[in-house]
Amino acid sequence: MATLSAARRLGTILAAATIVVYAQVARYDFVNWDDPEYVLQNPAVSAGLSLGGVAWAFTHRHGETWHPITSLSHMLDCQLYGLWPGGHHLTSVLLHVCATLLLFGVLCALSGEPAPSAFVAGAFALHPLRAESVAWVAERKDVLAGVLWMSTMWLYVAWVRRPSPRRYGAVVVTFMLGLMAKPMVVTLPLVLLLIDAWPLGRSLPLRRRVVDKLPLLALAGVVSVVTIVAQQPAVVSLEKVGVTDRLANAIVAFAWYVQKTVWPSGLAVFYPLELPVPVRSVAVSGLFVACVTAVAWRARRTRPWLFVGWLWYLVALLPVIGLVRVGDQAVADRYTYLPGIGLSLMVAWSGVELASRWPAMKPVVGAVATVLLIALAAATWVQVGYWRDNVTLYERALRVTHDNFVAHTNLGSALLAENRVSDALQHYREALRINPTAGVAHANVGVALAASGDHAAAMAAFERALELDGRDAATHVRVADLLAGEGHLADAIAHYQQAAALEPTSPAVHNNLGFLLAAQGNLTEAVELAPAEPRNRMNYARALARSGRRGDAIAELRELLRRRPDWQAAERELSQVLAADPDPARRTEAVALAEELVRTATTPDAELLAILAVAYEGAARFADALRAWSEALTAARATGRTDLVPGLEAAVAACRVRSQVGGTR
């Protein structure tokens, strides 16, 4: 009873401490690395949960891998919170708390010792290396996989102690869910083999214990193949990073993660891969790993926690150690989320041994463990704070790393989003200096130059980017936008067509191409490009209206609204087309539609009020039009729409004149 009471008290403290350290993320935004792909710019996810979304999750890659359970969790967040980043962050925090409590419960169930179990769970929850997994929305897969990893372990322990087909079935199902949250869970069957030896102490022959894991190993094999296929576009080729370099970096990484676990300073969102890997680093790291492995092997019977903890660490790291490379990072904090537990096991039960050999040391061991966890929590609070926004995150990375292409690139994009064009260009040029053969680096410089108004230099940068990587659809789009802005529609269309061929499923590319085709007068071709795409139909309707075919435009817009009755953009367009029609009945309909749009708006909308004013003028209701124009001007000033103010001021003045002279239309 006393043990149970102590476990509950420690569990409550663990949960509270974890929430306190990470709750600050509720105020944080999304970051511009992976979060757009995972949530913000992924219509299948941002639309929330639906049958179509569930089907998409199980049949498509998401973030260059297959993890449908993670995709569904992002969809559920969008269903609950929309695109409020705080909600997405808090879900990750709650999942991390759950993983922590499950780990604590599993270790208590395995060992019957709450104190060392609490230390391991506390180090798992509160170590600065965990900040990336919890504070980064795109890393939802880590915390979700953590919950399912711990759940599988707990169910496995229950099955070992009271075997039954139903209990084993629960183990298999939960493990499969874990694999579908993050494929890194494939190593769990091997970790279960380790805990068979300690602390479970199963006396069955090794062969029998392996047979127990065969269904799990089979599932792991299938998901490994699926993952390799799904990640193929993102896998770094052997020509770029050879086998020798991969092995060298893996050896250094095994030691680096231990170093950062012991002394977590200089942590960053991205660590550039240095090639060739320094021979000295490989030698020292290899010697360290070999020595610890030898010590753990020799202690496998007398101190089994050293052997189990060290092999847990090594085995769990294998999928992400870089032998199969996805991305250009040398190491990553998030990769320690599950492997780091093994290192904590080694420390915690060494403390137990120390206290049992010298009972007088027990209070000292407890005090040291408590101070360590408090220090880790304080360091994690600081580390989580770096995730408050893009600029803070990448500036931190640049302070603690060298020649960081990713940090310069992403910081440039963040600064450009804040309209700090000169600062953005500086970081884009630094990225270009680091990797002058990267097409994306030239393209980013082009984006910043275009934003600064230097279109000639921007075009030169884009052309160089396409020379290096002609299959970059985004650069073709940027060139097309620049050409279209200068009136070179034919050339712009050619680049959009190349972008559409490279990204045949991109709605934005097809929409913009359709708009340009319609502007050029190729109405039929514009619609045939993607006949079911609503925005293409909208562009078609606009082109019809501009060419004087108002009746056809109205029919097209009515059909759009029949299919999507809540599409306000189509309602706005229809109101404007109706207001310009010579038929008085249609002008009256324009007024009714515009009035309804204004009435249902949650806040004063200058553009909606302007549409209403146009509708009133079309119906010769000039007093009402003057009032609507004035309200639109007030709304524009109140909401900071300074771009609309001059035009609205002119409209108010013109309408006032028309109303005074009896209203000439």
Task: Name what the model sees in each region.
Residues 387, 421, 455, 489, ...:
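TPR-repeat structural position
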Residues 397, 430-431, 464-465, 498-499, ...:
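Canonical positions in the second alpha-helix
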Residues 402, 436, 470, 504, ...:
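Short coil turns that delineate tetratricopeptide repeat
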Residues 417, 451, 485-486, 519, ...:
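Register position in tetratricopeptide repeats
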